[in-house]
Amino acid sequence: MDPPLVNDSSFSAANPSSYTLSEIWPFPVNDAVRSGLRLAVNSGRVFTRSEHSGNKDVSAAEESTVTDLTAGWGSRKTRDLNSEDDSSKMVSSSSSGNELKESGDKKRKLCGSESGNGDGSMRPEGETSSGGGGSKATEQKNKPEPPKDYIHVRARRGQATDRHSLAERARREKISEKMTALQDIIPGCNKIIGKALVLDEIINYIQSLQRQVEFLSMKLEVVNSGASTGPTIGVFPSGDLGTLPIDVHRTIYEQQEANETRVSQPEWLHMQVDGNFNRTT
């Protein structure tokens, strides 16, 4: 068999003062990495002192140093990730805080505009820019409504709401309006209370007017008949004819008939005389 290439006696004790940490690890070193390197150096010292330990102990020491180094590097990565997460959280929290502030400012502006509309001190931007919007709205409100084709009747409790009953109520309302107009025309009718009494008063007043019209028509007939007759009636003035009694009218008519007979009688006698004379001859 060939002799082993490497013997335990060929390894010499390592001198830690002959090298530095910056030469071995050029990257920035954390506390975990330093602790791992220290463990590695200490394990090397233990390895040099123990001459009877085998290759298994050397491999175990190497594995421990590697695990320590990887653990330090992983802790650094986790710290970097944690710092990134914290920074992202801070940014998100600051952005959310700014959004909340902006939304709060908008709400305050809206609330202030709504509360200021009543006093006129604060107005929204649309009204301030338009200027005449408020006046147009007031003009539209002040415009009279167009006449409606239908009749609005308010139904009370217990009243029917069908078309027939609504039309009947509308008819009664029109009648009441006409009665109020007649009350204003007829003297003393405003003092009467009750529709029945008002109707009686209106009927009595209309009947009295009808009688007066009939009497005046009779007067006109008498005046017209007197104007068509001879000058005998001209002795009486026209204004006094209406006040004369009925007997006077009869005497006037009898005188007229007598005058007509007097005028017509000699003509009739003359005709008879002429006829007799002709026969005798």
From Swiss-Prot:
Taken from the UniProt entry, a GO cellular component term is: nucleus
What is the name of the protein in this document?
Transcription factor bHLH79
Q: Name one Pfam family in it.
A: HLH
Q: Which CDD domains match?
A: bHLH_AtBPE_like
Per the record's keyword annotation, is Nucleus included, yes or no? yes
Q: Which PANTHER family match?
A: STEROL REGULATORY ELEMENT-BINDING PROTEIN, TRANSCRIPTION FACTOR BHLH79
What SUPFAM superfamilies is this protein classified in? HLH, helix-loop-helix DNA-binding domain
Q: Where is the protein found, in the record's own terms?
A: Nucleus
Which GO BP terms apply? regulation of DNA-templated transcription
According to the UniProt record, where is the region Disordered? 47-167
Q: Where is the composition biased (Basic and acidic residues)?
A: 77-88, 138-152
Q: How does it assemble?
A: Homodimer.
Q: Where is the bHLH domain?
A: 159-209
Q: GO molecular function of the protein, one example? A: protein dimerization activity
Major localization listed first in the record, in broad terms: nucleus
Q: Which organism is it from?
A: Arabidopsis thaliana
The record's section on InterPro entries has: bHLH_dom, bHLH_ZIP_TF, HLH_DNA-bd_sf
Q: Which UniProt keywords are given for this protein, alphabetically ordered?
A: DNA-binding, Nucleus, Transcription, Transcription regulation
